[in-house]
Amino acid sequence: MRTHFLLCFLFLFSYLGATEISVDPITFNDAYTNAGDGDVLLLEPGIYASSVTFPSGKTITLKSASATELPEIRFGVSGNDEAIMNGGLIFDGLKIVPSGDYFISVDKVGDIAAIRVLNCTIESVNRCFIRTNNNGYSIGEIEFANCIIRNCGDKGWNFLYPKHIV
C-alpha cells in the first residue's frame, strides 16, 4: 500500500511540475530561457527567428498551439559548453526551416537526453539537420515521427552527423 501511495504521489508531483506556456515570437526567448523540465511552450502562429542554446538538465517541448497554422521555426539551436548535460528538445507540429547550415549544431556539449521531432515539416536544410561534434558523450534518443522532409538544398552534406554515441 505504501509503495502504491508513493508511486501515485510521485506521478502526480511530476505531472504538476510541467507547465504549458503560450508564447508568440516576441515572448518566446524569455519563456524558453525560464522553462522548467517538462514544460511545453505552445507556439502561436508566426515566424520564430531567435536562436537558442540547447537546454541543460531539462527537456523542453516546442509545440504548435494551432491545429491549422504551423508556427515557423527559422533559427538554430547551438551549444558549446561541456557543462550542458542531460537536456532534451522535443519539436511537435512545427514548420522547421533552418536559418544557417545546421538546425541543431552543438560542439562541446555533454550527454544529451533526447532530440525528438514529431509531426513536423522540415524543409530547406542547407548542410545538416543535426550536427554534434563531441566524441565520448552520448545522445539517449533521436526520434523522427510523422514528419515531412522536403526541399533540402544541394549543399546538403548529410541529414544527421552525430559524433556523440547514439
What function would you assign to each model-found segment?
Residues 63, 87-98, 113-124, 139-155, ...:
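Right-handed parallel beta-helix
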Residues 18-49, 53, 59:
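Acidic Gly/Asp/Thr-rich repetitive segments characteristic of extracellular carbohydrate-active
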Residues 3-14:
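Sec-dependent N-terminal signal peptides
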Residues 130, 157-158:
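Glycine-centered small-residue motifs that form tight turns
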Residues 49-61, 70-114, 127-136:
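Extracellular beta-strand-rich solenoid/capping regions of secreted or surface-exposed proteins
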